[in-house]
């Protein structure tokens, strides 16, 4: 009689032990912290004037180091896989935008095929954040298809805040600065401007606001530029194109998804500007803000010290870019 009773007690003991173990495993699982999602930032470079094929890998390295982000840089390449910013009908690797948490874009007058353009427009319509530079006000140029003409002007204006209008002129590109940059009144406490100090930019001033033109949507200027050498001044056209214009702003864009995206845009972007820590700081602070990480921007701005020298070629068209280079993963 005692033997079956012992078996019964042993069975109960085993069941209790298993139940306790199961509860312990459950508790451990519930108390484990959720894995932090690493943001995927895709840098889209497709312009032939301002050497973004050099500045974007540099910014991507900073984003990887400071944010711990996964970074992808995509380029215009030729048929042999070499980086060729003069090729306007192809950017290799845009499918990376399908998994992107942020698109950082520097494009100029591209005539991409529909499949490639759709990667960009689908991303924009998703409501995910965007950071844009300079010539992205005229990212596309479609001359021979009236159904695509909206991408030449209306599309960048509604997404980024403005389309291509004019600038104050080229003067010995890269030999000396031509624009003084300062904080827009009332924006001193904006997190994107942490660590900011006034500087002189090599980027000649773009006209985006004033005269017959106005920044679109809820654009809020953060930085102002003052042109120190202006073709419009020489030509007596300052009533239309003021010497003072916004050079950086924030806005929102609500696409077909119904989700409101954060957009940071700057008309800065000359390759020599990125030699200045303050310009790299504006770019990186803007990236943090776009991702909703503004509370993690240090008081003096994001650390933008470089692990290697940044020695870009000067701005300019034609064959001024560095040759025989292929895309490579950001280390």
Where are these regions (language model features)?
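Non-transmembrane alpha-helical segments in soluble domains
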Residues: 60, 121, 193, 284-288
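Extracellular ligand-binding/catalytic regions of CAZymes and related secreted enzymes
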Residues: 27-29, 33-39, 55, 65-69, ...
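Sec-dependent signal peptide recognition
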Residues: 6-12
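Short, Lys/Arg-enriched N-terminal segments with co-localized hydrophobic residues
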Residues: 1-4
């Amino acid at each position: 009689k005692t033997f079956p009773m012992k078996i019964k007690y042993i069975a109960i003991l085993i069941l209790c032990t298993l139940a306790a173990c199961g509860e312990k495993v459950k508790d451990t699982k519930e108390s484990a912290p959720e894995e932090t999602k690493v943001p995927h930032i895709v840098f889209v470079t497709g312009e032939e004037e301002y050497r973004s094929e050099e500045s974007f890998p540099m910014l991507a390295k900073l984003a990887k180091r400071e944010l711990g982000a996964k970074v992808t840089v995509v380029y215009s390449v030729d048929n042999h896989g070499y980086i060729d910013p003069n090729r306007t009908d192809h950017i290799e690797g845009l499918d990376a935008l399908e998994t992107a948490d942020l698109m950082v874009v520097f494009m100029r007058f591209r005539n991409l095929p529909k499949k490639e353009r759709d990667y960009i427009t689908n991303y924009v319509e998703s409501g995910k954040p965007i950071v844009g530079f300079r010539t992205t006000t005229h990212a596309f140029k479609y001359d021979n298809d009236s159904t695509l003409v909206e991408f030449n002007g209306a599309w960048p204006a509604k997404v980024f805040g403005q389309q291509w209008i004019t600038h104050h002129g080229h003067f010995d590109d890269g030999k000396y600065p031509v624009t003084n940059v300062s904080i827009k009144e009332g924006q001193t406490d904006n997190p994107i401007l942490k660590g900011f100090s006034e500087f002189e930019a090599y980027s000649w001033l773009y006209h985006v606001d004033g005269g017959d033109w106005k920044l679109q949507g809820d654009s809020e200027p953060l930085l102002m530029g003052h042109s120190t050498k202006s073709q419009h001044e020489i030509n007596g056209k300052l009533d239309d194109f003021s010497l003072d214009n916004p050079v950086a702003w924030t806005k929102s864009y609500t696409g077909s998804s119904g989700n409101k995206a954060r957009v940071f845009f700057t008309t800065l972007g000359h390759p020599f500007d990125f030699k200045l820590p303050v310009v790299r700081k504006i770019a990186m602070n803007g990236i943090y803000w776009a991702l909703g990480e503004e509370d993690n921007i240090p008081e003096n701005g994001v650390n933008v010290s470089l692990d290697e020298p940044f020695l870009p070629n000067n701005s300019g068209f034609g064959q001024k870019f560095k040759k025989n280079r292929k895309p490579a993963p950001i280390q």
